[in-house]
Swiss-Prot record:
Gene Ontology cellular-component annotations: precatalytic spliceosome
Ranges of biased composition (kind: Polar residues): 492-501
Composition bias type Basic residues, residue spans: 243-273, 329-341, 409-435, 448-468
Localization of this protein: Nucleus
Family of this protein: Belongs to the PRP38 family.
Record Pfam families: PRP38
Basic and acidic residues: compositionally biased ranges: 281-328, 342-408, 437-447, 469-491
Biased composition (Low complexity): 1-11
Gene that encodes the chain: prpf38b
Keyword Hydrolase tagged: no
Function description: May be required for pre-mRNA splicing.
Coiled coil ranges: 281-302
The entry's keywords: Coiled coil, mRNA processing, mRNA splicing, Nucleus, Spliceosome
Protein name: Pre-mRNA-splicing factor 38B
Amino acid sequence: MAGSQQQQQQQAVSKPTGGKHGNNLPLWGNEKTMNLNPMILTNVLSSPYFKVQLYELKTYHEVVDEIYFKVNHVEPWEKGSRKTAGQTGMCGGVRGVGTGGIVSTAFCLLYKLFTLKLTRKQVMGLITHSDSPDIRALGFMYIRYTQPPPDLVDWYDEFLDDEEELDVKAGGGCVMTVGEMLRSFLTKLEWFSTLFPRIPVPVQKAIDQHMKSRPRKPPQKDEQEEEEEEATAAPAADTGRHGDKRRSRTPRRSPSPRKSQNRSRSRSHHRERHGASFDYELERERDRQRKEREGKDRDRDRDRDRERDRERDRDRRRSRTPDRNAERRRSRSRERRRSRSTSRDKRTERKDRDKDREAESERERSRKKDREHHKDRERSKDKRSKGEGEERRHKDDKEEKKHREEKRSKRSRSRSRDRKHKAERSSKKRSRSGSRSRQEAGEEKNRKRERSHSKDRQHKRSRSKERSHRRESSNERIHARQERPSSESGERTNSVRADSP
């Protein structure tokens, strides 16, 4: 049998990992949740083990080593952390997503593998690992959650008759082979208290047909196993019914590969088969849980009966000892006295406290009054200073306004004076120019008259005298013309001096 297992592993390893898609392994379904139940995923993400310890693991080989040392079952919840026997999914009488229980180490590491985005070669290394069946189980579970349903048969077909055993239940008690586990993966959605991704109906029918064509092979027993079964058959017959119950509750488990020195895949098959399947194991587990619940109910009834017996004993003791009532009365009177004295002390303490509180309140009131008085003084000072400042500003504004008005009046007066001076100067200039023009006109008239008289008187004078006379008249004209511009220039200078301030 060990030789056949090694041949299967060699065939699986020699299977071409490239294929059409190469070494890259496509993911099916939700690429963020790995198609996990929301309750399990929430508990995985909030687990301190996943957030702290697994966060430090960065490589595929580190995660495989962690699986080897930490995983001892492939159930989603730890033992005793979820009180919902026989129920799956989101049911179980609990409300909310995060109320499932303590998520198992196996599922934390399974989601860690999903975060690494495994290649086809790495997945083949998981499902053909020779050190631990738990590593192989997580590899097959990774395929069930992440690969397309039509490809599941191609992945599992070579391992449907694998006889390597592992205990899949938390706390032990459910030993099965790898082949039985894979057949359960293909034919059932339920896995303890969770569900696998649903398989489409046509694909499921094809898988069922394939499983019918691949019936389970009877286990091949070695000679050593037959001898062990014969040796254990005799004491088993003597133990009786109780021994059978004890053996059915805790079926034998193959030795762990971690305790073996050579870590070989050849495991000793110690459990009795007799046609037992995985369904039978589950049914037996449910019976065990039902019996445990019945035992708990019996324990509760026993506790109630014991409590009743204790009450009866107390009543009997009370009836037997009547003196206890007197003693109780005395103790009650003592307690009353003590309570009275304590109450008096408490009253005095309360009075003292009240007095202290009143004195403190009076002090606080006086402090508040002083503060308010001081604030009022400060406010009055501020108001006075503000009023004085406003009055000063008002006076300054008035003075500035008066000064401005005076300046304006002075300017207006100076402007009026300048206008008057200008008008007087212009009138003087006009009068002077008129008088001068009149004088010149009179002089010319006189000259003309003299000329006419001279012409009449001296008509008979000589030409020399006439020439001299003409020269003199011309000289006079020239002299008169020269005097006119000089007089006009003098008047202009005088007017300019008068206009200048």
